[in-house]
């Protein structure tokens, strides 16, 4: 039976404490504890994390850490790092941390030398990367590869696409494009200006049977063979998969298969062979730096006491707002345009992991779980949705991400200052205004007409974290990824759920396969068991000019 922490006296104590804190404004918290902006910070590797603008006291943080400890975060953390089968519903180890482990580390799990296997694949990836980047690997007509197209979906797309966008200044290899959606527009728009002779496809699918991925891969194969012939397939396709039989049947040679393992889920796989396209783009040395950034946070998470452990603190703040305040969402706002896809990446990482309503033992959870992650880069969001963050009725904690040193910069209008400084001033201003706001007296003191005062009041007391890195590099990107990965783990342990399965995505897949014939089998009946779906199919078929066998 799962240890149900929500039924413990400690949970009750936190619930009672919440009612003591909920009526206290952040202005008051800073007035009574002026050093909190110095003390309520934590550093992890190259990241400076300020959590002082949260609706917590020092007592709150002590209780949250006590809750993490009581839930068994330390014990389960060690179980994860050492290969225990903590993914209980699938009876699997959870070893994404092994993907970035030092090669000298020994880890035997289920009779396999996990770290040795990882570095064998990394070496093969590096050798292949060097061949593509140097021009030693060429297409069927002898042309050098100029574009790599990554075909995958979910973790086989979101992580690599995010990392490629984030690290664009470090790209000195072939251009990489990403195709994920089964909508033909995705593949066709990416192929329209490409030359088959200079294009290499990386097909990423653990089973090599994922519907969307294999539909796109098959279409890409036709594109190659129609232009270059069947013999060209082995020179224009490689695979990231565990199913050699299916891959070789597709026409890819076995030596061009890069494997990964059941113990790494898709949303945790960007540091595995699923990141091959990123390695080709930035080179094996920078990819190693990327893995090193993840490893630095792994080591911080594994060895740092809970009281100063960044993933524990941030994960428990998420529990605080979700389970005690009833907050549904967290906004992640990177003030770095190259991190534009980072919120979308976090959506899968966090919501597929912790969007669960039963505990590991199958019993219903007793609290809200999971957070809805969303966001856009600053300052764009300030002209879109920040209005709701500042004056809306929803409580939405915010994570601000920023960097001290820009990779590229421009002068201000007067030619004196730095536009990056202006960007960062906006980041700090948003954090400050969310926390402290502007009350009616302050608005009126500006000469605002009395009728307009209520409209201009900013209530403040809106919580946020600010995470600052020195510069956006492969290492700091890896650090950010691991920082959020381990937050997910901490929350899952406290809520008693399995953060590493995703059964909720399966029924939709099977239902789509069942419904498909009603759309394209024009001699079959369109009725599928309920009037709504039947009506949608009928409307769809009529719009496509097909009237046979309609109810």
From Swiss-Prot:
Q: Which InterPro entries match?
A: G6P_Isomerase, G6P_Isomerase_C, Phosphoglucose_isomerase_CS, SIS_dom_sf, SIS_PGI_1, SIS_PGI_2
Biochemical pathway: Carbohydrate biosynthesis; gluconeogenesis; Carbohydrate degradation; glycolysis; D-glyceraldehyde 3-phosphate and glycerone phosphate from D-glucose: step 2/4
Q: Write the record's keywords in alphabetical order, separated by commas.
A: Cytoplasm, Gluconeogenesis, Glycolysis, Isomerase, Plasmid
Pfam families given in the database record: PGI (PF00342)
Q: Which GO terms describe its cellular component?
A: cytosol
Supply the EC number(s).
Answer: 5.3.1.9
- Provide the active-site residues from the annotation: 352 (proton donor), 383, 509
GO molecular-function term, one example from the UniProt record: monosaccharide binding
Q: What class of enzyme is it?
A: isomerase
GO biological process annotations for this chain's record?
gluconeogenesis; glucose 6-phosphate metabolic process; glycolytic process
Catalysed reactions listed for this entry: alpha-D-glucose 6-phosphate = beta-D-fructose 6-phosphate
User: Which SUPFAM superfamilies does the annotation name?
Assistant: SIS domain (SSF53697)
Report the domain of life of the source organism: Bacteria
Q: List the subcellular locations.
A: Cytoplasm
Q: What does this protein do?
A: Catalyzes the reversible isomerization of glucose-6-phosphate to fructose-6-phosphate.
* Family that this chain belongs to: Belongs to the GPI family.
Q: What is this protein called?
A: Glucose-6-phosphate isomerase 2
What species does this protein belong to? Rhodococcus jostii (strain RHA1)
Q: What is the lineage of its organism?
A: Bacteria, Bacillati, Actinomycetota, Actinomycetes, Mycobacteriales
């Amino acid at each position: 039976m799962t240890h149900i922490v929500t039924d413990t006296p400690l949970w009750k104590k936190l619930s009672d404490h919440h009612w003591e804190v909920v009526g206290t404004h952040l202005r008051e918290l800073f007035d009574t504890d002026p050093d909190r902006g110095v003390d309520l910070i934590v550093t992890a590797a190259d990241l400076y994390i300020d959590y002082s603008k949260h609706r917590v006291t020092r007592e709150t943080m002590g209780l949250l850490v006590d809750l993490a400890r009581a839930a068994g975060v330390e014990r389960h953390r060690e179980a994860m790092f050492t290969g225990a089968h903590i993914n209980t519903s699938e009876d699997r180890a959870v070893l994404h941390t092994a993907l970035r482990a030092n090669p000298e580390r020994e880890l035997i799990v289920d009779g396999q030398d996990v770290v040795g296997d990882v570095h064998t694949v990394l070496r093969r990836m590096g050798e292949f990367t060097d061949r593509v980047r140097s021009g030693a690997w060429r297409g069927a007509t002898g042309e050098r590869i100029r574009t790599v197209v990554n075909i995958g979906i979910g973790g086989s797309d979101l992580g690599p696409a995010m990392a490629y966008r984030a690290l664009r200044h470090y790209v000195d290899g072939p251009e990489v494009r990403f195709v994920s959606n089964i909508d033909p527009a995705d593949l066709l728009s990416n192929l329209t200006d490409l030359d088959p002779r200079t294009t290499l496809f990386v097909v990423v699918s653990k089973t090599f049977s994922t519907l969307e991925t294999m539909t796109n891969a098959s279409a890409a194969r036709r594109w190659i063979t129609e232009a270059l012939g069947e013999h060209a397939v082995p020179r224009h396709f490689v695979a990231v998969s565990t199913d050699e039989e299916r891959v070789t049947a597709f026409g890819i040679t076995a030596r061009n298969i890069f494997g990964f393992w059941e113990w790494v889920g898709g949303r945790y796989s960007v540091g595995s062979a699923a990141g091959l396209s990123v390695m080709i783009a930035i080179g094996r040395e920078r990819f190693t730096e990327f893995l090193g950034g993840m490893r630095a946070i792994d080591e911080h998470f594994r060895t740092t006491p809970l009281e100063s452990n960044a993933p524990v603190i941030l994960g428990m703040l998420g529990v605080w707002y979700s389970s005690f305040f009833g907050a549904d969402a967290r906004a992640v706002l990177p003030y770095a345009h190259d991190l534009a896809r980072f919120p979308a990446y976090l959506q899968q990482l966090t919501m597929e992991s912790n969007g669960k309503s039963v505990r590991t033992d199958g019993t219903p959870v007793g609290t809200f779980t999971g957070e809805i992650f969303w966001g856009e880069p600053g300052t764009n969001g300030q002209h879109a949705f920040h209005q709701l963050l500042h004056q809306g009725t929803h409580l939405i904690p915010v994570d601000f991400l920023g960097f001290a040193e820009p990779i590229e910069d421009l002068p201000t209008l007067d030619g004196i200052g730095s536009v990056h400084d202006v960007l960062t001033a906006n980041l700090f201003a948003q954090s400050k205004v969310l926390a402290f706001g502007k009350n009616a007296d302050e608005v009126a003191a500006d000469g605002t007409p009395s009728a307009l005062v209520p409209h201009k009041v900013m209530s403040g007391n809106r919580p946020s974290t600010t995470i600052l890195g020195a510069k956006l590099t492969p290492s700091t990107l890896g650090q950010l990824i691991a920082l959020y990965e381990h937050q997910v783990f901490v929350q899952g342990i406290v809520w008693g759920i399995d953060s590493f399965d995703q059964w909720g995505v399966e029924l939709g897949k099977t239902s789509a396969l069942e419904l498909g014939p009603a759309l394209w089998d024009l001699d079959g009946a369109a009725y599928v068991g309920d009037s709504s779906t039947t009506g949608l199919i009928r409307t769809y078929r009529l719009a496509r000019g097909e009237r046979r066998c309609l109810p």
